[in-house]
Structure formats: structure tokens, C-alpha cells
């Protein structure tokens, strides 16, 4: 179950009931859920995307010296390490998703149809597949009967895929923005919260732009499914468990990327300190907050 990246969602925990004890699944259950949902792999793609963003920005502006660029790339590799992102997401899921929803999602992902869908989504993650979809997806979507198109649109909406993709883009922009101020004398490093506020209008715009693209992607990715199978998938995503699954994983993703952007600022402050340079005031604030 994907839904972003063109698709992202994941899950779990906290039992409901007046006198029912709070029983929580083990971390192994959450790891299995993240793997089967595709989130495990998707989180490993964030750091390379960050590095690509910095390289593109550097090529346009040459804002950093070669030495500073190398330090920035090392800091990104550390701050956005896949294992660190996975740990944050898993911990957030453990703390916020009801156990019965975790069980329901895992049952779905483990079913024959759930496994088929996961395989389709995994195949769609390759660069070649994405390139083909960008061309064929819109044409396929335009050729679909209205009833099939409506199912695909409902699926994209139920999985919050455009929101998740926009969150990744904005949080990546925040990380790049903070990172590129490294080594630039007199240029303050803005707080993550301030940057989030500044980029919010762009995030809303990204959602608008990404939604039709994701619907076209979904038309292509899920083309092998029959109408009945697609109906079952949409019904699951729109169910109480599926809805919580999507919302909780979106919040967990945002938390993981926000923490990574903060870690990036801290890593760069550490590098400046090791080089014996005086930290800019804003970086001193970041370092103090980290402590």
C-alpha cells in the first residue's frame, strides 16, 4: 500500500475501551507493517533526493565552496539517514495508531490482494516505471470509463497521496534552504517552524499541482486490477482503519522530516565549531535548542 512518492501511508496503535488494558504490538510488528506498506523503502529515498536538491541548487548558484559543499553533503547523509527516519516514523506510529487498526492493516497487506497490490506499487517505484507513467499515465486516465476514473480519484484522496508528496517536497526544500546557508557569513539560519510557515502557501499549491499527476499515476499503477479488486482496495482505504493508517503515517512522515531538518542544522553547527569558527547567532540558537 503506497500512495505517494507518489504514495505513502503506514500505521498503528492504542486500544479503545473503558477498562480494556492498553496492549501494544511489538516494534517488529511495526517494522513488518512499514515494509509491507512500502514506507520502509520510500524513507530510504529521502536522503538521495535531498542530495540531488542540493546539487541542483549548487549548480545554479555556486553558493558554497567545495569544502563546505562536502561538509553539507556529509551532514545530509547523517541527518536524513534511512534508519533515523524509520525510527522516528515507527515511534510515532507506535504512539498514535490504535492496535486494532494496526491489526486490520496488517491483515489487509498480508491478504492475496494486498500482496498483489504491494507488488504493483513496488514495481512502480523504479525510475524506468516512473518515466513511462509520466507519459502513458495521463493518456490512460483520459481513456478510462467515468466509473473507473472515479475509483482511482477516490483512492488518491483516501491515501492523502498528494499531501504526502507535497510534505516531502516542502520538508526537502526546508532542509536544502537551511543547509545552503552554511558557511555564508551574516546569513541567518531560519528556524524550521518559521520556514514551515513561509512554505505553507507553496505546499498548498504543490497539493493542487500533484493531485492530477498522482491520479494519472494511480491509473497506470493499478491498471492490472479488475474493477472489483480496485473497489475492495478503495473500500479498505476509506475504512476507519485505512483512514487512520493514512493520517497517522502522514503525520509520522512530517515529524520525521522536520526532525531531520533540525538535525541538519545541528550537524552544520557542529562542523562550524570543529573548524574553530564563530557560529552565527541563528546557528547558536539551533545548537542550544538541540541541547
Locate the predicted segments by residue.
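Bacterial N-terminal signal peptides
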Residues: 7-15
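Outer-membrane beta-barrel domain signature
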Residues: 120, 125-133, 137-140, 144-145, ...
Amino acid at each position: 500500500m503506497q500512495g505517494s512518492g507518489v504514495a505513502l501511508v503506514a500505521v498503528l496503535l492504542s486500544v479503545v475501551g473503558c477498562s480494556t488494558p492498553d496492549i501494544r504490538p511489538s516494534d517488529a510488528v511495526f517494522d513488518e507493517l512499514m515494509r509491507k506498506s512500502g514506507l520502509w523503502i520510500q524513507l530510504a529515498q529521502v536522503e538521495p533526493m535531498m542530495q540531488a536538491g542540493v546539487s541542483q541548487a549548487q549548480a545554479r548558484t555556486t553558493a558554497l565552496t567545495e569544502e563546505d559543499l562536502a561538509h553539507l553533503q556529509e551532514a545530509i547523509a547523517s541527518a536524513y539517514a534511512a534508519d533515523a527516519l524509520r525510527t522516528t516514523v515507527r515511534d510515532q506510529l507506535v504512539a498514535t495508531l490504535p492496535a486494532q487498526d494496526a491489526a486490520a492493516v496488517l491483515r489487509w497487506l498480508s491478504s492475496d490482494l494486498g500482496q498483489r497490490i504491494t507488488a504493483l506499487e513496488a514495481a512502480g517505484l523504479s525510475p524506468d516505471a516512473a518515466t513511462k507513467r509520466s507519459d502513458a499515465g495521463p493518456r490512460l486516465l483520459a481513456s478510462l470509463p467515468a466509473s473507473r476514473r472515479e475509483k482511482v480519484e477516490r483512492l488518491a484522496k483516501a491515501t492523502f497521496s498528494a499531501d504526502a508528496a507535497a510534505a516531502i517536497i516542502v520538508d526537502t526544500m526546508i532542509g536544502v534552504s537551511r543547509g545552503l546557508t552554511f558557511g555564508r557569513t551574516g546569513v541567518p539560519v531560519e528556524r524550521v517552524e518559521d520556514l514551515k510557515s513561509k512554505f505553507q502557501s507553496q505546499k498548498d499549491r504543490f497539493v493542487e499541482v500533484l493531485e492530477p499527476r498522482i491520479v494519472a499515476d494511480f491509473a497506470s499503477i493499478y491498471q492490472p486490477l479488475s474493477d472489483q479488486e480496485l473497489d475492495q482496495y478503495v473500500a479498505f482505504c476509506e475504512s476507519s482503519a485505512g483512514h487512520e493508517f493514512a493520517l497517522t503515517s502522514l503525520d509520522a512522515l512530517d515529524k520525521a522530516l522536520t526532525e531531520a531538518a533540525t538535525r541538519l542544522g545541528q550537524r552544520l553547527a557542529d562542523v562550524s565549531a570543529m573548524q574553530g569558527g564563530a557560529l552565527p547567532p541563528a546557528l547558536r540558537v539551533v545548537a542550544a535548542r538541540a541541547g
